[in-house]
Structure formats: C-alpha cells, structure tokens
C-alpha cells in the first residue's frame, strides 16, 4: 500500500489523536499530533515496564508507550463512541503487540486484567458518573509502588481551594459537552487518589489547555492499603464499632 493509499484508508475512520503510521503518514486526528503528551510526564524510557491505558480510544498513548520500550501494554476501552476500527487499523499498520481489552473501567479487576507498573487514566475521569469508584478500580490494577497518571478537567474557580470540591454538570455546561459530568478541583483529585490507595500525589502539570491538569500518584503497598481500609472503617463507624475487623 502506498502512502497515499494508506492516508485514504485511514480517512475512513474517526480519529481523536493524530497517530504517525509511517514517516509521511499521520492519521487526521482532531487533537493534533503530540498535542498533549509533553505535559503528561510519561517517562521517555519504559523498558521493562507494564502499562495499562484505560480509556485508550484510538490507542495513541498505548502505541506511544510501546515505542518507548514498555514490556507489555494493555489498551482498555469499551469503544462505544466511534467503535474500535481506528484502533484496529493503527494496530495492524504499526504491527503492534499492544493487547486490546474491551472493558468498562468499572469492571476492571486485577484477577483478569493483571496489575501494572504504570496506569494511564487520561481524559476519562470527568466523563464518569462515579469517578471515585473508577479511581478505586484503576488503583486495584496498579502494582504496589506503581504510578498512576490522571489527566482531567478541573474546576478553575476552586483551583486554589485546599478543601476538596467537585462541580456536578447535569447538562452541557462544559464546552457544550453532555458527556462531562464533573469538574473536580486539584484537592479533590488528590484526596480521591489518596482514598483509592495512593501514598504520594503530585500535581505535575497544574494547568494546560485552559482547564486541564495532570496528576501522578504512587500506589501504596498491599499492607498499607489494608491498614488504611481498616482505619477508615473504624473512623467512619466509630460510634458503632465494637467488634473485630470484618472478615477477621
């Protein structure tokens, strides 16, 4: 297939990202090539690292991690908006070893998905009705000491508020997008990640593209997560807590 034929074939699909398929062939993505990857803080060298890309869409970040030497990359999505054709097309043309996983974030389970050194959760959180549950699910698929990268819209008005705030959007208030449910402030993102089992949370890119922010979080050890859950149960039920920890 010539370069022109490849461009024509790629043009049949909807692309959010511009993915370089060959030196002279880039998919016609809405967001532009490499539009935001520089602010995500993804390590340049991923040699030996396992990666889970949650909400991968057309696979841009999954393929990029593969290029950076990741040992294993799993690309997870439900592909409900525009289907999986664009992902499959790029996967084939790049001769990629990325593993597609058709799963809702709410259904992610380490028993079948595994646990990973690096989990990407980019441009997904604010689209979900249940963001804390989603963070708990991706944290469960992160190895102890592993890194979670979250890219999300934030609430600008409460950006400097140290109290966690999350604005609910029942309609199309944000960028005329009815799929945006929430705008958390940075404190809310950090505290939700902490409640999901992360020890360290860093706001690595405080603001880009007007209302977006990037966070890195380090997953606690299994023992630390167990102790946190135990203490949280006691704290939240301290008035009625008389017996042993459930299951003990």
Which residues fall in each region the model found?
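Core SAM-dependent methyltransferase catalytic element
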Residues: 196, 202-248
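Conserved class I S-adenosyl-L-methionine
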Residues: 49-57, 149-171
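Short alpha-helix
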Residues: 179-197
């Amino acid at each position: 297939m010539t370069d022109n034929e490849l461009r024509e074939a790629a043009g049949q699909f909807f692309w959010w990202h511009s993915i370089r398929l060959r030196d002279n062939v880039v998919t016609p993505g809405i967001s532009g090539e490499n539009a935001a990857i520089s602010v995500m803080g993804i390590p340049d060298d991923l040699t030996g690292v396992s990666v889970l890309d949650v909400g991968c869409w057309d696979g841009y970040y999954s393929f990029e991690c593969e290029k950076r030497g990741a040992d294993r990359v799993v690309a997870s999505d439900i592909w409900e908006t525009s289907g999986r054709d664009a992902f499959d097309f790029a996967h084939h043309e790049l001769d990629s070893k990325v593993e597609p996983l058709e799963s809702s974030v709410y259904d992610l389970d380490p028993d079948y998905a595994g646990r990973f050194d690096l989990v990407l959760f980019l441009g997904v959180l604010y689209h979900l009705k249940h963001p804390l549950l989603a963070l708990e699910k991706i944290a469960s698929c992160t190895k102890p000491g592993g890194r979670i990268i979250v890219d999300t819209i934030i609430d600008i008005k409460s950006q400097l508020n140290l109290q966690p705030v999350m604005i609910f959007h029942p309609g199309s208030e944000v960028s005329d997008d009815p799929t945006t449910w929430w705008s958390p402030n940075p404190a809310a993102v950090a505290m939700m990640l902490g409640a999901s089992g992360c020890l360290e949370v860093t706001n690595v890119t405080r603001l880009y593209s007007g209302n977006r922010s990037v966070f890195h979080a380090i997953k606690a050890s299994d023992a630390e997560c167990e102790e946190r859950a135990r203490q949280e149960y006691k704290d939240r039920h301290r008035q009625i807590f008389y017996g042993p920890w459930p299951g003990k």
